[in-house]
A protein has these predicted regions:
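Amphipathic alpha-helical and helix-coil boundary elements used as assembly
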Residues: 1-216
Length: 216
């Protein structure tokens, strides 16, 4: 919408490729992207892929594989599941501050955004000591509301990096930009720090697949 993404007065592309230029603009406004494989129209049709831009993952479909279960892969199972589960936590700042001079309104713009991520007792204490602060170029944002939205987008980027999971699965129909529920860990180690206390325990949560690679 025009309120969420105001029209840019000027865009400068310098010493960067077209994809790098577009990704820089998307990243600034909190727009994520991914590539989705489309169903083949016929067995002889060439593969088709769609570039997907999004600012919310709430509308993505469920994964074709359905609910997944973790196990060690040491025994024969009746279905394809997750055999490797590796949660990754990253310490991120507790506050983002952005300021800029708005020459159109002849006033300074300033906004801050605190984190909603929970990184454990020690992690939260360290996070409160970390600040992502920057003075942006003049007229960085279209308005005060846009300035706050851009600041919030930067904090949401940090929150996304707080917790992720790398893994392996024997399921052959996992698809990027879909989500699935993870049922049991069945002895697999790993607790996932994340946004809100509900993600402290890995079991029974929904996860979005952002990257899928195939081997073999």
């Amino acid at each position: 919408s025009p309120d969420r993404y105001p029209q840019r007065e000027m865009s400068i592309q310098w010493n960067e490729s077209d994809p790098a230029f577009l990704m820089r603009l998307w990243r600034k406004h909190g727009i994520a992207w991914g590539v989705r494989a489309e169903a083949d129209a016929s067995p002889t049709a060439p593969p088709r892929h769609t570039l997907v831009l999004f600012d919310s993952a709430s509308q993505f479909p469920a994964n074709p594989a359905g609910r997944l279960r973790c196990h060690t892969g040491t025994s024969v199972q009746g279905r394809d599941d997750i055999t490797l589960w590796s949660p990754v936590g990253q310490l991120t700042p507790g506050l983002v501050e952005r300021s800029a001079w708005d020459y159109k309104r002849q006033q300074a713009q300033w906004a801050d955004a605190p984190t909603a991520a929970r990184q454990g007792d020690e992690g939260d204490a360290l996070s409160r000591a970390l600040l992502d602060a920057r003075i942006e170029p003049p007229h960085w944002a279209d308005s005060g509301a846009d300035h706050h939205q851009l600041t919030l987008a930067r904090m949401q980027h940090h929150e996304m990096n707080t917790a992720s999971v790398a893994g392996a699965s024997s399921a052959r129909d996992l698809a990027c930009l879909t989500w699935a529920s993870i049922d049991e860990r069945a002895g697999l180690p790993g607790r996932l720090p994340g946004v809100g206390s509900g993600l402290a325990d890995v079991a029974g949560n929904d996860f979005l697949f952002t990257q899928v690679s195939h081997w073999g």
